[in-house]
From Swiss-Prot:
Transmembrane segments: none annotated. Residues 117-189 form the HTH crp-type domain. It comes from the Bacteria. This is Transcriptional regulator SdrP. PROSITE patterns: CNMP_BINDING_3, HTH_CRP_2. Disruption phenotype: Viable, but has growth defects, particularly when grown in a synthetic medium. Increased sensitivity to disulfide stress. Decreased expression of TTHA0986, TTHA0770, TTHA0337, TTHA1028, TTHA0654, TTHA0655, TTHA0769, TTHA0425, TTHA0634, TTHA0635, TTHA0636, TTHA0637, TTHA0638, TTHA0570, TTHA0030, TTHA0460, TTHB243, TTHA1128, TTHA0035, TTHA0520 and TTHA1803 genes. GO terms for molecular function: DNA binding; DNA-binding transcription activator activity; protein homodimerization activity.
Length: 202
């Protein structure tokens, strides 16, 4: 008999997990559909995106080991998730370990960008990363991202006002077109060159 997979769904904007020591009802999840954003938020309300979890990825693994969680997990789009069992089988643990390794490599890349790249370069890298997620779709042959300036600020470790200036600069230079709650990528090649450029400082 085929075992029915347990799933749960959340709407875009829903908070799935909160910081703190996992409670008895907390679970680890695998993303089946949609995109989950993991963010740390300081006392002033400034957010920093730690990781984007795409379909096939995992989050909330602290619940399996009783470790404290330092982030919020928010549904960036409508999502469908599979809660993991409290005692995963070896194959699932192997998948989880591989995902954690990839997530650690991604975290290293984010730290490197924060330390070595100017904000404009980090923004180009963030836009390209978002273009490969469920937040992206195609209009008239161009990639369009559904993203607010607050979300972009969290993605690059900055604040909304500064990000708005950088978005305006990228638009004037022809890399993107900015609209209400969305960004159209006009020059992917140019954005890739920016993203690969180191720059200095912030």
């Amino acid at each position: 008999m085929t075992q029915v997979r347990e799933t749960v769904s959340f709407k875009a904007g829903d908070v799935i997990l909160y910081p703190g020591v996992p409670g008895p009802r907390d679970r680890a999840y695998r993303v089946l559909e949609g995109l989950v954003r993991l963010e740390a938020v300081d006392e002033e309300g400034n957010a920093l995106t730690l990781r984007l979890v795409r379909p096939g990825g995992f989050f909330g693994e602290e619940a399996l080991f009783g470790q404290e969680r330092i982030y919020f997990a928010e549904a960036a789009t409508d999502v469908r998730l599979e809660p993991l069992p409290e005692n995963p089988d070896p194959e699932l643990l192997k998948d989880l370990a591989q995902h954690l390794s990839q997530g650690l490599a991604e975290a290293y890349r984010r730290i490197e960008r924060l330390a070595t790249q100017r904000l404009k370069n980090r923004m180009a890298a963030a836009l390209l990363e978002l273009s490969e997620t469920p937040l992206a779709h195609e209009e008239e042959g161009k990639v369009v991202l559904k993203a607010t300036h607050d979300e972009l600020a969290a993605a690059v470790g900055s604040v909304r006002e500064t990000v708005t200036k950088v978005i305006g600069e990228l638009a004037r230079e022809g890399y993107i077109r900015s609209g209400y709650g969305k960004i159209q990528l006009l020059d992917l090649k140019g954005l890739k060159e920016l993203a690969e450029s180191r720059g200095q400082g912030r």
